[in-house]
């Protein structure tokens, strides 16, 4: 077996350009020859399965689990790997490194320029189909990282699997993972320049685990069927500078509880049933929600946000929150959110020192820390940070119909 440093950069978790190592490559055999390579540390053997051909055994070329096979002609058809584990269990997967990345140079430029107001359509975890294969395309901004991987139950939370490809000067990393679907847990594992590992929640994640767990959750934001078309059409004709507004401000976690000792939160759907008629009977026109974005600390009332694009899972799923907004609108009640672009907490899984450096925050603590709250302050001078925050405001209006 070889000890090629080129291959070892994958197994030791330092590779920033895995497409240069894994997948299909030219071979020394000439123009009519290709090499397919895969890193499978939990497999004792790997077979290559091509359409219309019998499985072919791949050769283990590195003790840490690198397999490869040379083919006489380039593999243009889709192929899969069939792995057999050390316990003789087998599983079959498409090769992530056989799929094209989905961020164009324009996409990268707009984020870097700070003018992409809907970066949530490209960044984070995007469910999609590429070449007839369903999966999730991931993208994250971490310009000072040495290596970024996607980790989850699907790869035993092992950062040697699924290293992402750095996309040059944009600082964005990307990778498509076939077969992942809505509900799958994931994080980004980031190796910084000092050699330290960081497990981070997705800044653009659409859903999150219930605290104290901190993984992001793949979620399809386009499946909910809205029934508030009448409200949406009506609000376009209203001059809110002239119309009277009476807003009922409420913290969903404390307005009303259930359980023998009031220890349980109401769900978004239960709140829709109880809160909306209560507010309507009092004559209010709007409900103003204290922050419902994902946050680790109950006592912060939501004002220390980690998941800016995820409704807190304390009260249910993202679609449950859409149901709450939908029901408000059908009852003629507008919904306003308290939004927190001023600061964020120092929790290790959050935005702070995201790639081992002051990325979303100021490096100078005199500008980057809110002493009264013990939180970080956004660096509004960075284009990518402005794109993140503006996209977040647009996200809640576009996808959750916030007023």
Residue ranges and their predicted role:
Residues 33, 135-137, 147, 285-286, ...:
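Beta-sheet entry/capping signal
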Residues 209, 229-247, 251-402:
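Substrate-binding/active-site clefts of carbohydrate-active enzymes
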Residues 1-30, 61-142, 167-249, 254-263, ...:
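The feature marks proteins involved in alpha-glucan
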Residues 38, 50, 152, 161, ...:
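Glycine-rich, histidine-containing beta strand-loop boundary motifs that form or position
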Residues 46-48, 148-150, 186:
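Short beta-strand elements bearing conserved aromatic residues within extracellular beta-rich modules
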Residues 54-63, 160-168:
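Solvent-exposed serine/threonine-rich low-complexity stretches and specific carbohydrate-binding patches
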Residues 39-45, 141-148:
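Short proline/glycine-enriched turn/loop motifs at strand-loop junctions of beta-rich domains
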